[in-house]
């Protein structure tokens, strides 16, 4: 390991607030931005930060995620001294069971972590959209001689009650942690990104299990326990773009923010690329009747209608007379002749029949995976 740090991505979340989009796949496997899945951002951050050993902890509906990650080659994680490992719940003689929380998922994978023997473990969520240099966070952790470092981002005070809030002294040492406080004292919100000194965390988790102490969740149990025991716990203050895409509205917003030559994620930054599994598709075909404005259009698309301020993923068809506006269309979608789609997310493989109207002007509308709306035209 280049920097002595193992990354563990928590990717087992169901994401119930995404409704139809997570009925058959885990939230980190949901598509984003035309050619990515949400987990690609955490994996790419690891690759760009020089972290070459990554464990991906799955649980709910893992098949699509497992197929997407494979051996990690798309992120350069398939070398001799590197690897991406899928970690799923299993039954052992000690009675291991389904993960009961974030830190319990780490406890159940102690054998894997010990086989890597890292000095530090980086805990990540697989369902956020952002770019971060984890090595810079590690250097801050070392400089503070911290036992635990928590990445935080400033949020508006009116929104702070939705997050775990860190109250710090003038040196960024955390003196108090409040989970979703009614009257927040700070605007430093936890991003769910942690660096732990592994041996200290390991000891805590093992002792808690032996003594039947609930230490299953980082926010509810581990961080408060660290603070109570006087551990050196600091924040890492992140200033870049970060989006929790846990709701339909936030997922739609993040995709709309991704459109444009100078988007918040700076998608054309060659020094910090976002990698993904490559899918071979033919070139786009845009007919002479088509009209495409201010949109991202990925390979394999066929457009004979109008597309405005939208994202078309791989192999999307927009047939004659159809109009798509302010929408995110996932891969392999067919939009029939004369259909009208506004402020919507259309799931993979969906079919929108001729002259169907999907109007999200009040609330963002969602069509699920392989869902058929209206009567499809077989031509």
Swiss-Prot record:
Keyword tags: ATP-binding, Carbohydrate metabolism, Glycogen biosynthesis, Glycogen metabolism, Nucleotide-binding, Nucleotidyltransferase, Transferase
SUPFAM superfamilies: Nucleotide-diphospho-sugar transferases, Trimeric LpxA-like enzymes
InterPro entries for this protein: ADP-Glc_PPase (IPR011831), ADP_Glu_pyroP_CS (IPR005836), GlgC_bac (IPR023049), GlmU/GlgC-like_hexapep (IPR056818), NTP_transferase_dom (IPR005835), Nucleotide-diphossugar_trans (IPR029044), Trimer_LpxA-like_sf (IPR011004)
Binding site for alpha-D-glucose 1-phosphate: 164, 179-180, 190
Catalytic activity: alpha-D-glucose 1-phosphate + ATP + H(+) = ADP-alpha-D-glucose + diphosphate
Domain of life according to the entry: Bacteria
Top-level enzyme category: transferase
Pathway: Glycan biosynthesis; glycogen biosynthesis
Molecular functions (GO terms): ATP binding; glucose-1-phosphate adenylyltransferase activity
UniProt-listed Enzyme Commission number(s): 2.7.7.27
GO biological processes: glycogen biosynthetic process
Family: Belongs to the bacterial/plant glucose-1-phosphate adenylyltransferase family.
Purpose of the protein: Involved in the biosynthesis of ADP-glucose, a building block required for the elongation reactions to produce glycogen. Catalyzes the reaction between ATP and alpha-D-glucose 1-phosphate (G1P) to produce pyrophosphate and ADP-Glc.
Subunit structure: Homotetramer.
Name the record gives this protein: Glucose-1-phosphate adenylyltransferase
Protein source organism: Streptococcus equi subsp. zooepidemicus (strain H70)
């Amino acid at each position: 390991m280049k920097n002595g740090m193992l990354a563990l991505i928590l990717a087992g979340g169901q994401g119930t607030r995404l409704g139809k989009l997570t009925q058959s796949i885990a939230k980190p496997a949901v598509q984003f931005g035309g050619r990515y899945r949400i987990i690609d951002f955490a994996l790419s951050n690891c690759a760009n930060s020089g972290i070459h050993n990554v464990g991906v902890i799955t649980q709910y509906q893992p098949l699509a995620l497992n197929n997407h990650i494979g051996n990690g080659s798309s992120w350069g994680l398939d070398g001799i001294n590197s690897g991406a490992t899928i970690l799923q719940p299993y039954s052992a003689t000690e009675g291991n069971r389904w993960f009961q929380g974030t830190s319990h998922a780490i406890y159940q994978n102690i054998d894997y972590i010990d086989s890597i023997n890292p000095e530090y473990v980086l805990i990540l969520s697989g369902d956020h959209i952002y770019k971060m240099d984890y090595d810079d966070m590690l250097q801050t952790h070392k400089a503070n001689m911290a036992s635990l470092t928590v990445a935080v981002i400033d949020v508006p005070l009116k929104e702070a009650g939705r997050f775990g809030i860190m109250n710090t002294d003038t040196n960024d040492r955390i003196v108090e942690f409040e989970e979703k406080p009614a009257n927040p004292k700070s605007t430093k919100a936890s991003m769910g990104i942690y660096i732990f000194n592994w041996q200290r965390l390991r000891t805590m988790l093992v002792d808690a299990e032996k003594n039947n102490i609930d230490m299953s969740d980082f926010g509810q149990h581990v961080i408060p326990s660290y603070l109570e025991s006087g551990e050196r716990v600091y924040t890492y203050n992140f200033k870049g773009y970060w989006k929790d895409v846990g709701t339909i509205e936030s997922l739609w917003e993040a995709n709309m923010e991704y459109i444009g030559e100078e988007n918040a994620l700076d998608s054309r930054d060659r020094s910090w690329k976002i990698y993904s599994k490559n899918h071979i598709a033919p070139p786009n075909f845009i007919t002479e009747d088509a009209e495409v404005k201010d949109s991202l259009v990925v390979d394999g698309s066929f457009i004979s209608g109008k597309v405005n301020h939208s994202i078309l993923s791989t192999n999307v068809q927009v047939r004659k007379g159809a109009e798509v506006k302010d929408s995110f269309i996932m891969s392999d979608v067919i939009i029939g002749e004369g259909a009208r789609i506004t402020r919507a997310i259309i799931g993979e493989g969906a079919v929108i029949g001729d002259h169907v109207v999907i109007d999200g002007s009040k609330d963002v509308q969602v069509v699920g995976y392989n869902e058929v709306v209206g009567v499809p035209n077989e031509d």
